[in-house]
Amino acid sequence: MERRRRPTLEMVAALAGVGRGTVSRVINGSDQVSPATREAVKRAIKELGYVPNRAARTLVTRRTDTVALVVSENNQKLFAEPFYAGIVLGVGVALSERGFQFVLATGRSGIEHERLGGYLAGQHVDGVLLLSLHRDDPLPQMLDEAGVPYVYGGRPLGVPEEQVSYVDIDNIGGGRQATQRLIETGHRRIATIAGPQDMVAGVERLQGYREALLAAGMEYDETLVSYGDFTYDSGVAAMRELLDRAPDVDAVFAASDLMGLAALRVLRASGRRVPEDVAVVGYDDSTVAEHAEPPMTSVNQPTELMGREMARLLVDRITGETTEPVRLVLETHLMVRESG
């Protein structure tokens, strides 16, 4: 049997009735092609089963058409927290639409950061999406020194905003919404399980809690503030600490749904009813909140949209469509359920 000849760029051009250069521009995502011509080329590619030679394309474009999504946490936290699933989904969809793929990497220790920095600076990827950064993360400096473009997921702490691109959630507004809900439902001893204070989400959700209390003429009481790291186990410890310090607490705003779920279970174990004795509001509006017992009121943050926008900004930087830093802040809203 005669072996079928592998389709070539020239065969695609002939079938589409265009030049070889036009086919290259379509494959490389150039906007210098009319919609009708682009569709003709795509039809020819599909009909012939043409697969671009990625190695040859990389030599010409000096691009890999690959980006890295780097989560500055350990693997256990990445797969335990529902926040990351929405981000990964949004990133994947947006990159696929632009002809890019991505690799997922994690790292929190110094050794992991050093390894990651070497990989990211080694021309394996065209750009980097940075997620869940802490104040001391060295990766942005490594990328700057290597000339690799990147976009933050979340406003970075300690960095002049005008110098960087990021997509963030309105964490202050979300913290304010959660606390206002508890105030409006008649609660007066409102505690919070805040997130880590070396991350912008932890800092700003606590700020929103404080602002809501002060706006209502209520005192900000440090004894009603405990801290976790967004995980379930940290929420258990924080809720127990709050009950030891303030047994008369009548409401809790938890800065993540996992910490909110932990609060629900600790309260139940202590003999307190939710929401009759203590109301609870979480943050994420994840399936954790939806299936909690009772179902948990929670702040909805558009994580899939956040992932999409992060990917869009980065690809625009890689392709030269934008050169200036871009900053986006996405709105939150409250999903009211039975817990508060």
UniProtKB/Swiss-Prot annotation:
One Pfam annotation reads: LacI
Query: Residue limits of the HTH lacI-type domain?
Result: 1-61
State the GO CC annotations.
cytoplasm
Induction note: Constitutively expressed.
Which SUPFAM superfamilies does the annotation name? lambda repressor-like DNA-binding domains, Periplasmic binding protein-like I
Q: Where in the cell is it found?
A: Cytoplasm
Keyword match Oxidoreductase? no
Q: Which UniProt keywords apply?
A: Cytoplasm, DNA-binding, Repressor, Transcription, Transcription regulation
Residues annotated as DNA-binding are 9-28
Q: Which GO terms describe its molecular function?
A: DNA-binding transcription factor activity; transcription cis-regulatory region binding
Q: What is the effect of changing A55T?
A: Decreases binding to DNA and forms a less stable complex with the celE promoter in the presence of cellobiose
Segment forming the signal sequence: none
Known regulation of its activity is:
Activity is controlled by cytoplasmic cellobiose levels. Binding of CelR to the celE promoter is inhibited specifically by low concentrations of cellobiose, the major end product of cellulases. Activity may also be regulated through post-translational modification.
Source domain of life is Bacteria
Q: What is the recorded function of this protein according to its Swiss-Prot or TrEMBL entry? A: Transcriptional regulator that regulates the expression of all six cellulases, encoded by the cel genes (designated celA through celF). Acts as a repressor. Specifically binds to a 14-bp inverted repeat site, which is present in the upstream region of the cellulase genes.
Listed name of the protein: HTH-type transcriptional regulator CelR
Please name the source species: Thermobifida fusca
What is the name of the gene encoding this protein?
celR
